[in-house]
Amino acid sequence: MSEPQKAAAPTSALDRYFKISERGSSIAAEFRGGLAAFFAMSYIVVLNPLVIGTGADASERTLGIAPVAAVTALVAGVMTILMGVIAKQPFAMAAGLGVNALLASTIATTPNLTWADIMGLVVLAGLIMTVLVLTGFRTAVFEAVPESLKTAIVVGIGFFISFIGLVDSGIIRRMPDAAGTTVPVSLGAGGHLLGWPTLVFLFGLFFTIALFIRNVKGAILWGVLASTALSLILEAVVPSGSVKESATGWSLNVPSLADMKFTTPNFSLIGSADLFGAFSHIGPLAASLLVFTILLSVFFDAMGVSVGLAAEAGTMKDGKVEDIDKVLLVDAFGSVIGGGASGSANQIFVESATGIGAGARTGFANIVTGVLFLLAIFISPLVTIVPFEAVAPALVVVGFLMIRQAVNIDWTDWGLGIPAFLTIIFMPLSYSIANGIGAGFVAYTFIRLVQGRGKEVHWLMYLVSAVFVIYFGMGIINGWTS
């Protein structure tokens, strides 16, 4: 966990408002952090349209690549700035990959459901979360979690973002089903590290580690910039192309210094969500179950990510995230606004840890990140120049920084150690923060009951554990109701 430096006296109104000096930071550090966070997150403007922009709904309508890209950048920019201004935390926001994958798969498998319908359900989930925050329920759940489980969430997120970095950079690859093997992943292509993009990742990883060891300020950002420069040179001299063309290609976008060009954004999706359409098209029960699924995923993702990021940024006091009620309120707005713009629920992005690793400690870094997202609406190369292989090393290094907190977990108490272990291991292996939290919560309440120490468990933990049991059993429930 990062320790804030000794606070200096505020030098301006901006400094006082964002608590820059109070948190031991500086304008320069916040700029570095904001830039690093944007570079780590900008891929979402490319990826989100591919996830939800191409699939046809029941009316044979697609959202479209260009409109989704426009609203993805717009809502990410607006919500990130709002989080910085209102909550004053360096927690950037964008369309959540878990939720958008859920929406895409639901559209593909549910007859009579349209994109307008399902985006309306996202808005409803956001409105329910807003009510839960305003009534204090969401914050109460947050505070009912034992400290060891909160620490386990931080460690689990550390493993998760490191795993994301390794997988999305191609160092660890998913094994194709046709391979006929029970091994789900392998090292590189066919068990070997191949290709220039892999070299960029390895260079970035060891260069960033070296900068950290030498205590260079902005090590994360310098690592991303140096890796990006190397990727541009390599692609110009020895083109690798996309991974779609070759197993040794770039994983998401091919780095290139294309001419800066201004594009006219397409905002036609804004306001197209149908709040109650799903209830008439697929029935009240099925629609309610979908709202519940979306709500639970977003609800606990935010809780876990905010704990992890605040612990790394040093913005926790007495085991609580500073201004957590404001953090959760803005996060709830992210689903309302994201769904209303048909860009999917916007959530606190775990890649914000990259910005924190580069020096971000306050909401001012969010202003930098948010403005860059808004510029990306009009200037296309902003989100295509940096390949994921240049950003992935930062995720791995920041993951290591978060994993170090495992020493603060009481592993000698089975009632804390086993739930902590399940929380940690479920996050990367199920590719879901919410799943890890749920596994830990259910195990915690169960083991405490077996130990005869059930009275030590907060009643909200019993309630939330019961909800997670229902959530994990949704497949069975859907089978009964279909």
Where are these regions (language model features)?
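A generic, lipid-embedded transmembrane alpha helix
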Residues: 72-84, 104, 158-162
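Residue-level signature of catalytic and energy-coupling elements of molecular machines
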Residues: 31, 51, 141, 218, ...
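Hydrophobic/aromatic residues within the transmembrane alpha-helices of Major Facilitator Superfamily
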Residues: 35-42, 78, 85, 162, ...
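Juxtamembrane transmembrane-helix boundary signature
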Residues: 2, 75-97, 128
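Membrane-embedded alpha-helical modules
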Residues: 111-233, 367-482
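Helix-loop-helix junctions within the multi-pass membrane cores of secondary transporters/permeases
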Residues: 10-48, 75-76, 96-105, 109-154, ...
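Helix-loop-helix hairpins and the membrane-proximal interhelical loops
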Residues: 2-66, 185-189, 224, 228-325, ...
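Hydrophobic, aromatic-rich alpha-helical transmembrane segments
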Residues: 22-34, 61-69, 73, 114-118, ...
